Curated annotation (Swiss-Prot):
Substrate binds at N181, P182, P183, Y184. One of its GO terms (molecular function) is nucleic acid binding. This is Release factor glutamine methyltransferase. SUPFAM superfamilies: S-adenosyl-L-methionine-dependent methyltransferases. It comes from Chlamydia trachomatis serovar L2 (strain ATCC VR-902B / DSM 19102 / 434/Bu).
Length: 290
């Protein structure tokens, strides 16, 4: 086993993988359904398992993300199928959604929740799992992505609604709470991104026009129709887009705040649909604002 893992690690290193030993072990642990690294070193592989292991290693060597090789991720207690038709849920999103869940648990009067551009369904399904009093609707423009989200809802026994369509088009009434992770990479950022992103994750879910800001202009134009008066929304944004997004919404008379993550990078934009200029902080634990 030591020899196999050493060869696997050396192969991944030669392919530019940043943490080759850890990833060689992770891929093998997933294949053998072993949760302990110490148990891994005691395992024995059949010739068929070795062949399958090297097949997965070669995929990783081609810079296919590990999550796509495994075919699943865990997100706040929800097991999600992930394929190249959907984005891989990010850790910073998981940390943030924990706080959104806390907000909904504190504000029981907020009973309708939209997860727009839902992809795998990670946000909406996690909200439904932890906030059963909330009616959750997930939407996406991609039929393939929506099919995966629906499959994830079934496998986790979570009752939610699904709508197929572009941004806010499929919704017929406004929500109390909205979360949207629109495409926000510029062309330049996309072509400079890691091969794991550029060559494997879905272009349509990543790129928001030449500047990366196309969808925020559209959202700002129609946000009053999608949120009830007093409704709140959080939009995921690029790490340097905070000021630009704030100006887009302010130009439409919508006040909001940029929330930063633990690394002090722009991460979310909080907004509230109300007639006056006062906006509640939108701050959640671990995310500062400006």
């Amino acid at each position: 086993m030591k020899k196999l893992l050493r060869e696997a690690s050396e192969y991944l290193l030669s392919r530019g993988i940043r943490f080759p030993q850890r990833e060689a072990e992770d891929i093998l642990m997933d294949l053998l359904e072993i949760s302990s690294r110490s148990a891994l070193h005691q395992a024995k592989l059949s010739s068929e398992e070795q062949s399958l292991y090297w097949k997965r290693l070669r995929k990783r060597g081609d810079r296919c993300p590990t999550a796509y090789i495994h075919g699943k991720v865990h997100f706040l207690g929800v097991e999600l199928q992930v394929t190249p038709q959907v984005l891989i849920p990010r850790q910073e999103t998981e940390i943030f959604v924990e706080q959104i869940i806390g907000y909904l648990q504190m504000h029981k009067e907020k009973t309708t929740f939209y997860d727009v551009c839902c992809g795998s369904g990670c946000i909406g399904l996690a909200v439904r799992k932890h906030c059963p009093h909330v009616r959750v609707t997930l939407s996406d423009i991609s039929p393939e992505a929506l099919a995966i989200a629906e499959s994830n809802a079934r496998s986790n026994a979570l009752a939610v609604d699904f709508l197929l369509g572009d941004l806010f088009d499929p919704f017929s009434f406004p929500a109390d709470v909205l979360v949207c992770n629109p495409p926000y990479l510029s062309y330049k950022e996309f072509f400079e991104s890691d091969p794991e992103v550029r060559c494997h994750e879905p272009w349509k879910a990543l790129v928001g026009g030449v500047s990366g800001l196309e969808f925020y202009h559209r959202i700002a134009t129609h946000i009053h129709k999608i949120l009830v008066s007093g409704g709140v929304g959080w939009l995921e944004i690029g790490s340097t887009q905070g000021e630009d997004v704030k100006q887009i919404f302010h130009a439409k008379g919508i006040r909001g705040r940029v929330l930063k993550d633990y690394a002090q990078l722009d991460r979310f934009f909080f907004l509230e649909n109300q007639a006056n200029d006062a906006v509640s902080s939108g701050e959640v634990s671990g995310f500062s604002e400006r």
